[in-house]
């Protein structure tokens, strides 16, 4: 009986060619698994059938949109996760979910080998293979695009020589990855850091000047860190992301032009569109400013960068990431309330906050009548707070 390879299938050129290549080079049967993460574009049934037409013995589509929103996007919101303080992990958080479903498919379809279509220069090869190792260390992994140094030209030539039914073009300038959390664009003329993105780079967002005279104001409600309503209308996490993608995207919000440090040691330029993600993280951060005690908030902000780095580096299933999740979940117990935001000209402006768990005390904060802050206590506090610095200064100055 032939081995079975379970392939993470995108429907694009590389993974379509991989189906035929794996069969020819290894004699194995290929089971193609496509994961719907809300990426839009082609109908998933078309993608499923394409895999069969390319030679897969079975082709499966998994609707993972709600799972992605609830179990991957929501923890990212809770962690205010922005890699290098900018990137909301658009692609990075999707890979562990894909890994999970590929492993499940391997178990249910008799697969002993798993495969992906990643190159050897990017982060995704690491995310996939480290994930496979964490969930199913017994499975073998093959990566034809990386291991045989496929170029787009080689893949197109193989497709033409083997009559693989996929429309391809050498003129497509960009590499694009997208899901409901956002969209990532790279390569082409963007590899020159001085080149400004052109209009055709963007899809999830409009030019920030298009709706200049029609700004949008909205209220996002959270319950223990989870977005539960927009303008008073109950929403699921998926619905919140989808609605904010449309509304914030219409205002040009969520465009990011980033030079980032890849795990493999190189710097790369990426253009991201993440309107819903950026609005939700901004609103969530602001609610935490209102509801988290100072020392807890300070420590959480330090931890957030490490959480982001772990996820970016493909360590979603690591013991440290698991431990940090426990900490983050604890911090969310009182992150309940409403944040009002103004979206305009590509910018997000918070202009209102309210929470039953607020630590903001008006009587302590006000400078007007009703001030309950005992200013007489401040003199001694300042003296004690600066005492160690004062002692050191006297020593250094010889006083």
From Swiss-Prot:
InterPro entries: Arginosuc_syn_C, Arginosuc_syn_N, Arginosuc_synth, Arginosuc_synth_CS, Arginosuc_synth_type_1_subfam, AS_cat/multimer_dom_body, Rossmann-like_a/b/a_fold
Binding site for L-citrulline: 87, 123, 127, 175, 260, 272
Gene Ontology terms: biological process: argininosuccinate metabolic process; L-arginine biosynthetic process; urea cycle
Positions with a binding annotation for L-aspartate: 119, 123-124
PANTHER family referenced in this protein's UniProt entry, alphabetically: ARGININOSUCCINATE SYNTHASE
Entry's family note: Belongs to the argininosuccinate synthase family. Type 1 subfamily.
Subunit (UniProt): Homotetramer.
Protein name, per record: Argininosuccinate synthase
Origin species: Rhodococcus erythropolis (strain PR4 / NBRC 100887)
